[in-house]
Amino acid sequence: YFSYNDKVIKILEAEYLNTIHHVTAGTVISDKLEIACGSGILQVKKLQQESKKALNVEEFLRGTNILKATILK
């Protein structure tokens, strides 16, 4: 899970990509909600904002604008 705009968002489905990057862990590195991890990239597929229904990443991003280079915690 991560927090964004004071809301908890659960990652329900994701794929790990074993890709080298040079950014801080937690940084959004693409418009498709790919997040840098310690030693790779987490490609988010499905998530759920608190008190909302589960959505695939495309549906979620239509209503929530998480910009590239945002650092998630």
From Swiss-Prot:
Top-tier EC class: transferase
Catalytic activity: L-methionyl-tRNA(fMet) + (6R)-10-formyltetrahydrofolate = N-formyl-L-methionyl-tRNA(fMet) + (6S)-5,6,7,8-tetrahydrofolate + H(+)
Pfam family, one: Formyl_trans_C
A GO molecular-function annotation: methionyl-tRNA formyltransferase activity
Function, in words: Attaches a formyl group to the free amino group of methionyl-tRNA(fMet). The formyl group appears to play a dual role in the initiator identity of N-formylmethionyl-tRNA by promoting its recognition by IF2 and preventing the misappropriation of this tRNA by the elongation apparatus.
Family note: Belongs to the Fmt family.
Keyword check for Transferase: yes
Gene: fmt
Species of provenance: Rickettsia akari
Stretches that traverse the bilayer: none
Superkingdom assignment: Bacteria
Keywords noted in UniProt: Protein biosynthesis, Transferase
Protein known as: Methionyl-tRNA formyltransferase
EC number: 2.1.2.9
